[in-house]
């Protein structure tokens, strides 16, 4: 058996478990989650690699898995092998420059959102009497409003921190000096600003397999 490497810590985002990128072939969500949690448990036992989630992320993920009728086995393994820890909100310090940057970015996004709204209003005014083909119950104005919601949401939220859960993830990672594992580009952008290590969710299972293969190459390189 090889010597254990320096202890590694990771803080996991909801997107890690839900992304299709961690699935093999025609593997479904439940099978992919079980495979991932098995890797996490083996990495903990063999190399003392610890995985964490803030309570807000754990609750969000549990709700999403339950909504998808995922078995209790997955939820039990999640509770067993992923440590739920509240971030130290009053102890972790955030540079003022990052706060100013966030304020400036959100102000710019609000301005862009207003332009999206103005464009939609003009379009609705031009076509309010028309109906949408194949949808007799939906007027062109309804269609414009529907498109507006999607475009406005993308303009304001894509690539930015947009929830307390995202912020909890970063604060906990900073507190623990841990790597962030996520598929969310907004979290990745801010992990860079915080000076945190991060990893795309799709690359996390291969990373754990490499750690495990260093100890048992015959088993883990065959399974990868």
From Swiss-Prot:
Please name the top-level EC class of this enzyme. Answer: hydrolase
One MF annotation (Gene Ontology) recorded for this entry: ribonuclease P activity
This protein's UniProt keywords? Endonuclease, Hydrolase, Nuclease, tRNA processing
Residue ranges annotated as coiled coil are none
A Pfam entry, by short name? PIN_5
The GO biological-process annotations, alphabetized, read as: tRNA 5'-leader removal
What's its EC? 3.1.26.5
Name the chemical reaction catalysed here: Endonucleolytic cleavage of RNA, removing 5'-extranucleotides from tRNA precursor
Q: Which family does it belong to?
A: Belongs to the HARP family.
Role summary? RNA-free RNase P that catalyzes the removal of the 5'-leader sequence from pre-tRNA to produce the mature 5'-terminus.
Q: Please give the name of this protein.
A: RNA-free ribonuclease P
Q: Which organism is it from?
A: Haloarcula marismortui (strain ATCC 43049 / DSM 3752 / JCM 8966 / VKM B-1809)
Which taxonomic lineage is given here?
Archaea, Methanobacteriati, Methanobacteriota, Stenosarchaea group, Halobacteria
């Amino acid at each position: 058996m090889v010597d254990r490497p320096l202890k590694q810590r990771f803080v996991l985002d909801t997107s890690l478990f839900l992304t299709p990128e961690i699935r093999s072939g025609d593997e479904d969500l439940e099978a992919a989650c079980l495979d991932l949690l098995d890797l996490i448990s083996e990495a903990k036992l063999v190399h003392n690699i610890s995985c964490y989630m803030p309570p807000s992320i754990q609750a969000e993920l549990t709700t999403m898995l339950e909504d998808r009728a995922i078995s209790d086995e997955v939820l039990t393994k999640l509770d067993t092998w992923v440590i739920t820890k509240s971030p130290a909100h009053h102890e972790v310090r955030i540079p003022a420059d990052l706060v100013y940057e966030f304020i400036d970015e959100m102000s710019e996004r609000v301005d862009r959102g207003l332009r999206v709204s103005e464009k939609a209003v003009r379009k609705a005014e031009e076509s309010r009497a028309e109906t949408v083909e194949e949808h007799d119950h939906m007027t062109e104005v309804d269609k414009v409003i529907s498109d507006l919601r999607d475009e406005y949401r993308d303009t304001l939220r894509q690539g930015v921190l947009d929830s307390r859960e995202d912020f909890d993830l970063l604060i906990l990672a900073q507190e623990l000096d841990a790597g962030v594992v996520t598929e969310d580009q907004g979290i990745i952008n801010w992990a860079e600003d915080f000076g945190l290590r991060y990893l795309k969710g799709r690359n996390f299972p291969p990373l754990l397999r490499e750690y495990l293969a260093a100890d048992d190459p015959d088993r883990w390189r065959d399974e990868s």
